Amino acid sequence: MGRIVAGLMGGVPVVVMQGRVHYYEGYSPEEVTFPLRVLGALGIRAVVLTCAAGGIAEGYRVGQLVALGDHINLMGWNPLIGPNEPRFAHRPGAGLRFPDMTEAYSKALRALAKQAAAEEGFALDEGVYLAVSGPSFETPAEIRAFRVLGATLVGMSTVPETIVARHMGIDVLGLACVANLAAGLGATALSHQEVFAAGRHVEQRLALLLERLVPGIAALVEPATNEEKQP
């Protein structure tokens, strides 16, 4: 079961969602992205999406945090398929039938995250996240193909939420934890247990990073105007 917690972090109003549903669990695209629609209706201007991912790039270490600079959608579906819903847009220029994804992940928020990470004493690399539908882990041959495509990370979430957030005009910062080395790159078979173990290993570092980040994000992202809040 997931949880929703609303409160203040560094004096900044935040909504934190713990847990998400996935397409591989049998949920529809609308259900997978519904939390983002709710957050958009609440008037949020930026979202930090976190995920666990398999590391494809050479040099990645289990437990490493990586900022998403771009993504490749190989899930086989797009959450915007169907009638366009411009009423969900919460910023001028958003809600388009064909939203631009040139900067799916905010360059300004990535720079802010790198600065916050440096202040915490570690480097935050950028990566390209490739999304598949799951639930089976990828094969070594697929990982070799994904590397040719330019992917440095692979996972089963995040991309649908990013697409919907950008459709609504919400700025996105994506942070991935390298939970394992992708298939064929490590010495052992992949398991969900190692994903959980990596998450526990990085949770404190991620919490400290977010504490530094939130005030900076609030200062960077302008609040919604009364006109924009009107339905």
Q: How should each PLM-predicted stretch be described?
A:
Residues 40-43, 147, 166:
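Non-catalytic positions within long, well-ordered alpha-helices that form the structural scaffold/packing
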Residues 1-101:
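Metabolite-binding pocket within alpha/beta catalytic cores that recognizes anionic/polar moieties
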Residues 100-147:
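Active-site rim beta-loop-alpha module in soluble metabolic enzymes
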Residues 16-18, 47-51, 67, 124-130, ...:
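General beta-strand structural signal in soluble alpha/beta enzymes
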Residues 183-231:
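His/Asp/Glu-rich mid-to-C-terminal helical/loop segments that flank catalytic regions of hydrolases
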Residues 92-106, 131-133, 143, 199-213, ...:
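Polyanion-binding loop/helix "lid" in catalytic or ligand-binding cores
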Residues 156-194:
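Zn-dependent metallopeptidase/amidohydrolase metal-coordination segment
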